[in-house]
Regions:
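FAD-binding core/adjacent interface of flavoenzyme oxidoreductases
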Residues: 1, 6-8, 85-184
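Beta1-alpha1 glycine-rich phosphate/pyrophosphate-binding loop at the start
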Residues: 6-89, 93-94, 184-185
């Protein structure tokens, strides 16, 4: 289970924790931060497993390589600073309702070194806004062959695969063979 750090706001303030920094969670944390956090009426914390927000309807542009992500992503920490809420980086891995705690996974650098340990975050009010995921509607072959576009990581993975397939096709002698470079969009 590992060691845990307990993150507790000032005891006299109501602590509202919003898990999920998608469009809904980010909007809620921003609104609550402006109305309550900036005025010292409540402590607002946004939790997300990513450090930045990218508007989900733009993921297809990342996948196609037609958008500069750096120009469109929003740093949660900066948004929190501007709008009166705190940001905690980490993935929700557990919930202790009896003690009013969300359990956040440890976070790591790319090479595996720990950034933050597993920790518990105390709340008075909890909002789970973890969003949605793509539905394959039982379409044959989708689970085995498709890359869903639910996250920036998935969109970037698709873009790399597409570019690599194009490079491979361009480098061969002769024309592209049927089935060598197929792209199908579902949805």
């Amino acid at each position: 289970n590992g060691s845990r750090t307990l993150l507790v706001p000032k005891p006299e303030m109501t602590h509202i924790v919003v898990v999920g920094g998608g469009a809904g969670g980010l909007e809620l944390a921003t609104t609550l931060g402006n109305k309550l956090g900036k005025k010292g009426k409540a402590a607002i914390t946004l939790v997300d497993k990513s450090r930045t927000h990218i508007w989900k309807p733009l993921l297809h542009e990342i996948a196609a390589g037609s958008m500069d992500v750096d120009q469109h992503e929003l740093e949660y920490m900066a948004q929190g600073h501007w709008h009166g809420f705190k940001f905690r980086y980490g993935e929700l891995i557990g919930l202790n309702r009896a003690n009013k705690q969300v359990i956040l996974a440890a976070t790591f650098y790319e090479e595996g070194r720990e950034i933050t340990p597993q920790r518990a975050l105390v709340y008075d009010i909890l909002v789970i806004a973890i969003g949605s995921v793509s539905n394959d509607f039982g379409t044959p072959g989708v689970k085995e062959h498709a890359i869903m576009l639910d996250t920036q990581v998935q969109a970037e993975k698709f873009n790399r695969r597409l570019l690599n397939a194009c490079v491979r096709a361009q480098a061969q002698e002769g024309p592209v063979r049927p089935g060598q470079l197929d792209v199908t969009i579902i949805g």
